């Protein structure tokens, strides 16, 4: 790997230098060839294993943990930082640079009495979801590899330590800006320095002046809205949408007790530590705006409040338009050249009525959408109908859907298009759990198979049909803990 060190050299007050503590008897558990290509790597080598497990220095790496703060479950925590993630620098790839971070690399000055380690199950889950979201076309950070070990760590019980090697276009979070506004009061110079660095590095088309700052914040608002619209369309619940887990670039970031929906449930909670459902699936769009409001509050020393409010008011439109684009594609509705407010309203009602029917009839979210690839929309009798207990309500919806759909002349092409946007395979929690259990038993084959299948989620892959089935009773709607 070839590194540059722009963050390290230009923002010395934004991190602490710290070196990883090596895993004992490291071994490759997973490797993403797609992600490796981003930074010019090809194969997982023994030399690379030693370096990424913290047992040998990597040429050009600097090793540091970033400092930031954030709102966690609505309350402000003045000092957080990378408690177990150590960044090596920005690896230069054929199409840009990517931060390389060792998540689980050992304690840092921000570990808050923690051991700085990640357990194997959380490392595998983060790897799988990073790559699964990417192949579902959801904006996300990436995962290069998982490295296992025989090092014991204690959570609820004894487990083994592992490292997820994360790739990110940037690790700058909403919480970085909050830290230098709230926790380091009087450091508006550092806030401005961070803002100028972010624009120069990631928005080079913008200027570092008042007009550029406003244009940048608008881009952040729009990118965040688009990311969350993708989550809602694909049925993804993040679980811990604290502001320190929000990427400034609008990439899905810092995965913990996440879940993809099995049965559609608007108020689904995937996080055992969120009994009130602050971060429930249906709450995510509102939380996204709340988090952006906290970011805006931190930016008041450099951007006038009236401008920030005006930009925040554009969040809903960006969210709705992206959501409509994605959901119209799932339904096969014509994307209008000039969408009117009335048409948008009608389409949102049509989509909302269908998801309400899915919830009332306890239908599987992914499987139901996938059936549109077998649907003949010209037929008066939908093949979907048998899945609904209340067939009368479905018939009413289906008539409205057919009216909005209009004439479909090439049925085969229409069905192929539906299969290209409605995945057959998603990362169901029970599938991840089965792969983790197999890894604990020394068998990597189920993990490798699951990774391979999730890299082609829209393909039929009939030999893997069982991975597309609804979960067994024990695996339905699993709620995960934040323990990692």
From Swiss-Prot:
Q: Where does ATP bind?
A: 81, 83-84, 103, 115-116, 166, 173, 254
Q: For Mg(2+), which residues are the binding ones? A: 245, 254
Q: Which cofactor does it need?
A: Mg(2+); Mn(2+)
Task: Name the catalytic site residues.
Answer: 244
The EC number of this protein is: 2.7.7.-, 2.7.7.108
Catalytic activity as recorded in UniProt: L-seryl-[protein] + ATP = 3-O-(5'-adenylyl)-L-seryl-[protein] + diphosphate; L-threonyl-[protein] + ATP = 3-O-(5'-adenylyl)-L-threonyl-[protein] + diphosphate; L-tyrosyl-[protein] + ATP = O-(5'-adenylyl)-L-tyrosyl-[protein] + diphosphate; L-histidyl-[protein] + UTP = N(tele)-(5'-uridylyl)-L-histidyl-[protein] + diphosphate
Annotated GO molecular function terms are: AMPylase activity; ATP binding; magnesium ion binding
Q: Which domain of life is it from?
A: Bacteria
Keywords attached to this entry:
ATP-binding, Magnesium, Manganese, Metal-binding, Nucleotide-binding, Nucleotidyltransferase, Transferase
UniProt function note: Nucleotidyltransferase involved in the post-translational modification of proteins. It can catalyze the addition of adenosine monophosphate (AMP) or uridine monophosphate (UMP) to a protein, resulting in modifications known as AMPylation and UMPylation.
Protein name as it appears in the record: Protein nucleotidyltransferase YdiU
Lineage of origin: Bacteria, Pseudomonadati, Pseudomonadota, Gammaproteobacteria, Alteromonadales
